[in-house]
Amino acid sequence: MNLHEYQAKRLLAEEGVPVPRAIPAFSVREAVNQARELGGPAWVVKAQVHAGGRGKAGGVRMVDSIAQVEKAAQELLGKPLVTAQTGPQGQHVAALLIEEPSRIARELYLALMVDRGQARITFLATREGGVDIEELAASRPEALHRVVVEPSTGFLPFQARQLGFQFGLDAGQVQQLTRIMQGMYRLAQRLDALMVEINPLAITAEGRLLALDAKVVMDDNALYRHPESDELFDSTQQDGREITARQFGLNYISLEGNIGCMVNGAGLAMATMDLIKLHGGEPANFLDVGGGAAADKVNQAFKLILSDTRVKAILVNIFGGITRCDLLAEGIIQAAAEVGLHLPVVVRLEGTRKEEGMALLRESGLSLITADGLTDAAMKAVAAAQG
């Protein structure tokens, strides 16, 4: 679960990480009032969305009058912000962060993340802040510094000192960096976070280290341990179907194509989408109904797909290991009766109780296209969507 910048900064500040003075605003009037409370002569108005690239997209604005604060708030609030990470539909701006500007002498990058390869929490840092870290890792991996935290000891201060001196910080700044890294580590443990990122970590003209932007990602699998996550969750940043899917325990991600996919198992779902693209189609979604999907769960999954008006055809690809094909067939029949099936549906069933499932579908009177094998199913789905 992603958090907004203003939420991430508040949580970091609770752990002693220095952040600029800033106040969130949820209306134009609030934006003006918060700017007056902070005092001038200048402010930074930041759109709050779960996506990077806000600056290049016009979502971060430097202003030097209250009138300009009001104008920026009017232009941003309630509108979609399209960045390189959002897709063409953009993300809805429901909040702003009104922040005092900082005099920046130098920028660093610092992030804590879970390194699954090493099964360790790892700090990733570079002398170049404000950059696209993925591009830097690909083009100049030697510029990245890694600090691996041993689970038996936790994060130790000497690790921050080593990093600070490598970056050419003075003794006072190294002490600040140590406190910042300790705070990030405490926050990650407290929230079960997969990532705590500060980009950039600024060194101001006065020599202070300051978290100018922050990102926190909580582990969805640990949210049950964090009732406070309900207050942090922002439904405006997710597709409505994704929110519904989450309520029913389905793994759903909306995409840009017109072929709806219902598959059991994440790996099989990705392979299905790959084959659709290989044969000239575009998947409308990733949808994993899980290993032991019951009829009601499949019913809800089918409704999710049918609620997407872009979908022109549906591909159901089930390998019945834990999932019984006859239960899935019951879910399809139930959903078709409730929603009304008006699109071509390609069905590929293999495995447990396949024959019983296919018999149920045949006896239902539904107009279905059966497929032998995954390649055949993908080709038929693409043809159905195109014609």
Curated annotation (Swiss-Prot):
Residues 9-244 form the ATP-grasp domain. Belongs to the succinate/malate CoA ligase beta subunit family. Pathway: Carbohydrate metabolism; tricarboxylic acid cycle; succinate from succinyl-CoA (ligase route): step 1/1. ATP binds at residues 46, 53-55, 99, 102, 107. Its EC number is 6.2.1.5. It comes from the Bacteria. The keyword Membrane does not apply. This is Succinate--CoA ligase [ADP-forming] subunit beta. NCBIfam families: PRK00696.1, sucCoAbeta. Heterotetramer of two alpha and two beta subunits. Keywords: ATP-binding, Ligase, Magnesium, Metal-binding, Nucleotide-binding, Tricarboxylic acid cycle. One of its GO terms (biological process) is tricarboxylic acid cycle. Its cofactor is Mg(2+).
